[in-house]
Amino acid sequence: SGYSYHVMPEVAWGINKNLMVRTSMFVSNSNNQLVAEGASFYTKYRFLSTDDLQSHFRMAAYGRYSFNNATIHQEQIEIMGQNSGFETGIVATQLIKKLAVSASVSYEKAFDNKPDYRFPVAQSDNAMNYTLSLGRLMYPKKYTNFKQTNINTMIEFVGQTLNENGKSYLDIVPSVQFII
């Protein structure tokens, strides 16, 4: 068909205010038919929360394990849809009035993909990931209740440095977020 696409449906559940779990599935048409290529399991535990009126500071630790049965076709490590492996890291978020700033750092390790797609020996199989996100509440200008839809504008810097060869990647991701 000339088009290649990946779909990653996921389900997330906030068990309580400190613990969240998420599972994702990886589906693509990379072999000219729609197939499930793998899945991911994620958990995040908030261990610090300092809340005040119109501001908060929070920190959490997280981990993800993914398995994938697709061919390995890129040097960048990405266990959300491309590689089998794990990731573990921490995230910190500061909210001041309508501005949110979030930063994270994590370690990511890739494994061989099943059934027999070996991770290339010449490539780095582990990396450090880092993000910086800035988001601003655009709507509502003033809350009348907490059931109102939020509209946020955001920009995120998503980076990765491969530990064995020093190569780095940086994506800049602008977005609009709707919280319904």
Regions found by a protein language model. Name each.
Residues 1-103, 107-112, 121-180:
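Transmembrane beta-barrel domains of Gram-negative outer membranes and organellar outer membranes
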